[in-house]
């Protein structure tokens, strides 16, 4: 086989002309360490001294590249593969011609040569050439390089209603999105708050979150995303206001009549810090009498929360219309009720009970959405008028089934609440003391901010209201606390031996 003269003539011609795009489109060249080779430098004599043609016994080579897409402002890799009879050719020089300029790269052990280059927006033809050697014939090829505009991004606060309070470990969430609003997944976001740095990777919807445990005050949280092809960098900041801490969550639920019978002095002596007073007390005794009693309790160091029933009034009330959509009018009335009690003088908090479906949530598409909406709305409206009001909710003690049966989405609800109180009534569930520990651990792990104060049954069960002994109450309370609870709430005054919380 004779070495064709025409190949070198064509190679010289190609190397001497420009590619599709003009030379002024090249913005930067990265990692180009080899000298630029001019076509005429590679011309070799193609005839022997006696004027005869040299017989070619060399192997053929193949130089193959693929069409590539890159982005302006980012480097683009143009990679080719040099092979001969199925074998990779290593340590061979390959010439790339892009936008009128030539660059030389050397193949690696796999026969690959890569040019790393920055180009402006446009479409380019990249030529690549292997000029052959003593053993191998030359080869060449070309591919299209398409350079697109980079993708602009922004970082947005995902939820401005999240609750921050000293003593809580509250979630802080941002979302990385494109200019069209699509979430960007798998990217690292860096946070800086109170001279500490954190990082988190965005999920499939573009959300990145960290947890903040801060003392009372106002903090500037900054967050940023560094450019990562094809996405451009973005950043932002947000002020977080952290409220004052809560006292220990040790106390009791109490029916309205308790304000006439309970001994506040005795409760104080036993370390009681919280009483959840049923709102019916206002109907039964009037606002003046109740507020006077609340003031008296406060003198004993006991905080009073108004215990409000939400979606149960002798029967279950669905926060949904007949067509399954959210009943905003109903929920607005219920929110107003919660806000009303929060504004009463001396009230430390509002406690929402029956904040759920009665075991039928799975029958309605929007059940979870309705409960989440109500919790977020109620918390936001209360904090407009009483920023430091403690907002709590009673929840069912079934961590894996709360959403399915009751519409209680714990990770979402706990972003807004200060406290959740799982009603871990072991007698009703035919469970033992260890179960209380398990329940508390599960809810602590699911919380995105709210503390867990565990609600325990002070009597054997609803079928047997025999009071549990003080020693048994202590064991139950300790089990809750070892599970991560920050307090224990007993159900209830009137059917309980008073617990000495100092022994817990």
Task: Identify the residue ranges that each predicted region occupies.
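Aromatic-lined carbohydrate-recognition surfaces of secreted/lumenal glycan-active proteins
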Residues: 251-255, 305-309, 370-407, 450-461
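Low-complexity, acidic Ser/Thr/Pro-rich repeat tracts that form intrinsically disordered stalk/linker regions
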Residues: 23-69, 75, 83-84
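Enriched for extracellular/lumenal, surface-exposed ectodomains of secreted and cell-surface proteins
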Residues: 98, 123-143, 193, 216-238
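Boundary/entry segment of secreted carbohydrate-active catalytic domains
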Residues: 243-273, 310, 393-397, 459, ...
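Active-site-adjacent "subsite" loops/lids of carbohydrate-active enzymes
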Residues: 249-254, 290-298, 303-345, 474-476
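Aromatic- and acid-rich polysaccharide-binding/catalytic face
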Residues: 277-283, 348, 352-353, 405-434, ...
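Substrate-binding cleft of secreted/luminal carbohydrate-active enzymes
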Residues: 422-433, 450-504
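Beta-strand-rich structural segments
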Residues: 65-86, 128, 161, 165-181, ...
């Amino acid at each position: 086989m004779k070495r064709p003269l025409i190949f070198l003539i064509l190679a010289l011609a190609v190397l001497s002309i420009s590619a599709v795009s003009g030379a002024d489109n090249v913005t930067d060249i990265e990692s180009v360490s080899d000298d630029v080779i001019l076509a005429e430098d590679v011309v070799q004599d193609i005839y022997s001294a006696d004027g005869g043609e040299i017989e070619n016994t060399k192997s053929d080579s193949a130089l193959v590249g693929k069409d590539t897409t890159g982005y302006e402002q980012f480097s683009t890799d143009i990679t080719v593969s040099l092979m001969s009879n199925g074998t990779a050719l290593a340590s061979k020089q390959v010439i790339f011609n892009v936008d009128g300029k030539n660059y030389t790269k050397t193949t690696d052990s796999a026969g690959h040569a890569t040019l790393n280059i920055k180009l402006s927006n446009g479409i380019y033809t990249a030529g690549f050439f292997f000029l052959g050697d003593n053993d191998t014939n030359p080869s060449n090829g070309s591919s299209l390089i398409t350079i697109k505009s980079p993708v602009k991004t922004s970082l947005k606060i995902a939820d401005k209603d999240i609750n921050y309070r000293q003593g809580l470990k509250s979630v802080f969430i941002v979302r990385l999105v494109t200019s069209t609003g699509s979430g960007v997944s798998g990217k690292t976001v860096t946070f800086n708050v109170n001279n500490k740095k954190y990082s988190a990777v965005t999920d499939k919807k573009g959300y990145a979150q960290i947890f903040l445990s801060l003392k009372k005050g106002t903090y500037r949280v900054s967050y940023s995303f560094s450019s990562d092809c094809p996405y451009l960098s973005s950043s932002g900041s947000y002020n977080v206001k952290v409220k004052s801490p809560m006292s220990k969550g040790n106390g009791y639920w109490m029916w309205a009549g308790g304000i006439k019978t309970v001994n506040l002095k005795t409760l104080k002596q036993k370390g009681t810090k919280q009483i959840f007073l049923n709102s019916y007390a206002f109907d039964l005794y009037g606002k003046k009498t109740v507020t006077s009693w609340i003031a008296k309790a406060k003198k004993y160091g006991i905080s009073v929360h108004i215990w409000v029933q939400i979606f149960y009034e002798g029967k279950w009330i669905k926060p949904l219309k007949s067509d399954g959509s959210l009943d905003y009018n109903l929920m607005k009335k219920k929110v107003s009720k919660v806000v009303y009690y929060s504004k009463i003088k001396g009230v430390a908090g509002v406690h929402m009970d029956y904040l759920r479906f009665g075991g039928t949530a799975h029958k309605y598409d929007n059940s979870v959405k309705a409960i989440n909406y109500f919790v977020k709305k109620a918390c936001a409206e209360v904090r407009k008028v009483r920023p430091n009001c403690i907002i709590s909710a009673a929840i069912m003690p079934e961590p894996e089934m709360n959403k399915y049966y009751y519409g209680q989405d714990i990770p979402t609800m706990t972003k807004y609440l200060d406290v959740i109180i799982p009603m871990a009534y072991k007698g009703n569930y035919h469970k033992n003391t260890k179960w209380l520990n398990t329940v508390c651990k599960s809810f602590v792990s699911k919380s995105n901010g709210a503390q867990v104060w565990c609600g325990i049954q002070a009597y054997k069960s609803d079928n047997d209201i025999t009071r549990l002994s003080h020693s048994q109450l202590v064991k139950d309370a300790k089990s809750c606390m070892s599970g991560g609870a920050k307090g224990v709430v007993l159900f209830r005054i009137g059917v309980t031996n008073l617990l000495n919380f100092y022994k817990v």
